[in-house]
């Protein structure tokens, strides 16, 4: 009020009164007005000052919501003055306590100097003032308590020097803007501005970063402070400074509790489409929280929300369903951990977002609220919580098998635990390590993958159908396949010889062949990944031979020593024999076979390597393949070899210990085998040349070496390049032993054969059965056979050498109950996908018939029919290619009879059941190799990328062009062999429908595929072994081979374990084994032919049901769609097309499945994956199609109805999809067979050329299935059926399943079927099949077949549906539409 001077309120009033009249009376109104204006301005100024003096109540004045007027200010001033006076009067009566500085009743206003510190103490913070430039104008002294800085250290410094760099931008936003913009105070809101924000301030350390700039990041520590900022009005001036341009802040610590549970939790927003798929992520809010690692937080939160809510009371799907219905939804609280172990509690709230225009639901907007828990940064003791997948077996690669059995079992996901095979593996564990794992100490070279420890996704390797070829922990590289069968990755070790490990053979052995199909698939998978050989561990003892599982083809790191498992691993053990470990000999046998096949494949790559490899292959194959005893011998020998073989991963990847069932038998037989092997080794060690050894062996045994020698003889020089595995030599021994296993080397001629091994160190083992086309280039084995006596081309000799594969364990169907009949014989191939895939048998199966789709010679050498068990699948392909198969192969058509060794591995019982899991869908490899042997053995032998060697696979040869889907379907089809389709049909699902490929019925069809043309007609008299082994160009050469084999036998018999081991090394068997693993199938060589073989084998299952259809079914039974031959008749179709003259009539359409050979394991994997996916799609699509097909064929009412028997429960281990597919295949095959039988009768005079039904337009794909030549009308086959029987005849769509009554579906659509007679009634191949409910088949198949999954609509299985296949549907009424030209879709493949 001092500004008023002596004036008082009254004078002001009187002055005002005077002013008014003067303004009116004064003649100079302008002058008077100006004076009044000045006074008013002065008055307003004083009133503003007065208002400032009562600023304590400024907030009350602000409540006026208007600029305070003079009256209000004056009134408030008077009130406060009175209040002060009253307080002063009362204070005189108060005691000292009331006069304390802290008392609110103290005289006057609290002293500024004392008020500030008190307030700061109460707030637990410090005060600082920052100007608009960010310079600290003032800071309270207690800042030292918080930041360790002194007041003078911070004043006049930049606040940004103590702020975290990530907080500086936000801090700048909080600085006063009015001052910065120069906006006058009154233009702003009259209220004071305040806000709260958090920032991180640097705490001074002993060595301040301002003093020392080194290692600042390591030393800097920040304190999170909560700042309350206030911007003062412009009128507030102190000491000449305009505080309006400053921000006054009080900073206080944030407590741990507040930090952990902030009032405002972190959050981020995601946008989802109506299916719940993430469309957009808005992380701005988290990013602004300035917390490091917010990206990881978001990722983990979304993973937890979307992918780990299954099995919880809530799922994101339910959450969004609720949001869709109610518009809003929120999840319960869920938790996840960050990388540093901090636990975060989260909750998601979602809102349905609608299109503002149409109001249609557009998607969901989800806000995820995150709350970090206290003690936030604790290390996560459980890396698994972080999604870190600890290595299943932390042990060194050498200790891969070190896991305790229980651990192995735990890790082994034995989906097929019920399977004897899976049990076998578990039993195998008893052989020292869990899961037949080799002793804890693996060879140092063995690498253990985190998943090696029997992480069998499918079954343990042991499980017959599911168990991959003994995939166990040792197979780090095995691809884990979702399939029920243990995929190659299922048991990490599945191929390794380690006892617990399921070596390809081992697991198959464990599976007793039952696991073979899965094993084959697994091996196939492993091969595709190159996993097989690595399983082999260096053998602790020479006796222990780690036979590289070709199938495993795992890196040598995967090598596993089964030494610890002394018990023989009867590789060939039946499922029943799962307990006994697999015999090395069988492993060797498989190795030999696989090696041969692999060599053959290589041969396709190069004539030189092919010739050389053929020589070794012959030798190995002789050693491994001969005698039906093989399974039994293997079983028995496995015991002897057990120490070796159990430790040894057979070339087939069989761990002798892996087979559990045959320990006793293996021991007996193994003893003899071991003796022989020892002889051979001793001879070799003594410096005897291979020729000498062969002679000695022949002399010792008094037997001809083998016709295999004959086969090998033609390949005068075979250079087998294989990766050298330390255990290969031992594996070589295994092969030799396996050969020796066959006590009855029957070809005296072998004595005369003088093979020369230019490189003894080449490891025969390289011929390991691993399908992986790993060529062991480490060494080259050059075997020169000097012709001795002419070896009779008699297939019988080969049979003697290789043994009747049908009778042999190889043929035993692990899946089928018959496996027991075969006993240990079959297990080798069955159990070991590796064997199946790359086992010499497989190789043979695929290669031996140069022109034959299935390399009947190799597997077919042993008449598949002979096999009591329906050949599960290709596992016996090699067997099919074996001499007996060859016998049947005098004409490929005979293949059905003697060697429907097509990849189909015909089960004489008419079972298409895959021999093992290998044969099962999961195992295309053998099939591929077998099914699509190239024009020459080498090409035929070339392993399909998928592991065409796998006997159980109907894989079309890699070389055969074709749509991948077709390959895949074919592969699936192969796995779906009747056993597969029959689904564990121990006996032929169709009940020996056809005599299981009468010898005459298959040959042409099979040959067609193989022949691609006339090639299919390649000399029927050729021994399958010759074909497999690269048959000697001359009889003399064959004789030399036989002599050589005999000599080898003698040598091996006389050699001790060490000597045998040395011999193996000298022979380069280990190299061969690894090479076999490395060998990649030559796509060109097999191209269409491999598939046909696969198909051929399967037909046997169906052949029985339809009289005369055995061959027809084999050849054409599954040919159903000429264009579509891929599905079942693919091989046939291709063969027909390729050969143009030999429809694979004897072969099932599968035989025609020609999988293009993919040298790349990638193809194998792709095929496996496609199978799995394709099966699913096929199941879905086929079901839909089946439903459609029924109406399609009203005219052919019975056309599509499959007479499929419900698959035997054996396939319980198969995936439901696989089972369903197999069932469909069975149905389709039966239908086709039935139709084919009728059609053959009708069409015997008809040309083979494919012609879609009049009412059906063939799809382009039908024109060229699998990219293979369209099915040409083949000249009349050796079969009784017309050449185009099963090709042109309107068989069921290859794999078309009949959802509804086949007739109805097919006939309506295909009413004008080309078949002279509708297959309607024929459609129902058998009452069994009729019994199949369209929706569900009694078969263990988890997947109900669509109605009459048999509906032959190839479309059903072919993605062609009624369209592509429908074109043929007319034909398909009962006969599968001639879809040979149609490539099979991946779905079809599964049929």
Swiss-Prot record:
Residues annotated as domain PAS: 112-182
Biological-process GO terms, alphabetical: cellular response to hormone stimulus; positive regulation of transcription by RNA polymerase II
Record domain bHLH: where: 27-84
Reaction equations catalysed: L-lysyl-[protein] + acetyl-CoA = N(6)-acetyl-L-lysyl-[protein] + CoA + H(+)
Polar residues biased stretches: 857-870, 1300-1321
Motif (LXXLL motif 2): 736-740
Ranges annotated as spanning the membrane: none
Keywords (A to Z) from UniProt: Acetylation, Activator, Acyltransferase, Cytoplasm, Nucleus, Phosphoprotein, Repeat, Transcription, Transcription regulation, Transferase
Enzyme class (EC, first level): transferase
Taxonomic superkingdom: Eukaryota
Modifications the protein undergoes after translation, according to the UniProt entry: Phosphorylated and acetylated.
Pfam families (UniProt xref): bHLH_NCOA, DUF1518, DUF4927, NCOA_u2, Nuc_rec_co-act, PAS, PAS_11, SRC-1
Cited Gene3D superfamilies: 6.10.140.410, Helix-loop-helix DNA-binding domain, PAS domain
GO CC terms of this entry: cytoplasm; nucleus
Tissues expressing the protein: Highly expressed in liver and in early stages of oocyte development.
UniProt motif LXXLL motif 3: location: 1048-1052
Modified residues annotated as N6-acetyllysine in this record: 614, 617-618
Region (Disordered): 1-40, 85-107, 636-666, 816-880, 1242-1279, 1299-1321
Motif mapping: LXXLL motif 1: 680-684
Subunit architecture: Interacts with the histone acetyltransferase protein EP300.
Family: Belongs to the SRC/p160 nuclear receptor coactivator family.
Entry function: Nuclear receptor coactivator that directly binds nuclear receptors and stimulates the transcriptional activities in a hormone-dependent fashion. Plays a central role in creating a multisubunit coactivator complex, probably via remodeling of chromatin. Involved in the coactivation of different nuclear receptors, such as retinoids (RAR and RXR), thyroid hormone (TR) and orphan nuclear receptor (hepatocyte nuclear receptor 4 (HNF4) and constitutive androstane receptor (CAR)). Displays histone acetyltransferase activity.
Domain observations: Contains three Leu-Xaa-Xaa-Leu-Leu (LXXLL) motifs. Motifs 1 and 2 are essential for the association with nuclear receptors, and constitute the RID domain (Receptor-interacting domain).
Protein's name according to its UniProt entry: Nuclear receptor coactivator 3
Organism, as annotated: Xenopus laevis
